[in-house]
Amino acid sequence: MKTLILLSALVLLAFQVQADPIQNTDEETKTEEQPGEEDQAVSVSFGDPEGTSLQEESLRDLVCYCRARGCKGRERMNGTCRKGHLLYMLCCR
């Protein structure tokens, strides 16, 4: 059941990212990727702030990063993340 809810949340996130129009502006196309920006730490939480049964130890230990060039080592791609108008891969371990 927890897996189903987690997968549903990731699917909804993917649909939301695809639904938002990506607008290319002159400034954006001129902007080069800055060094060090490919590894942005992301906090991932599920449920309400007071906690639910979803926030068990296995989910609290989930660490995710927004990466531009693919996941590293033991990480797996779990969707996408956005910084401004740029899309990155959401890599979690």
Swiss-Prot record:
Annotated disulfide bonds: C64-C92, C66-C81, C71-C91
User: According to the UniProt entry, where is the signal peptide?
Assistant: 1-19
Write down the SMART domains for this protein, in alphabetical order: Defensin_propep, DEFSN
> What PROSITE patterns does the annotation carry?
DEFENSIN
Q: Kindly state the tissue distribution recorded for this protein.
A: Paneth cells of the small bowel.
Highest taxon above the source species: Eukaryota
Decide whether keyword Signal is in the record.
Answer: yes
Q: Which residues cross the membrane?
A: none
Coiled coil (residue ranges): none
The protein here is known as: Alpha-defensin 6/12
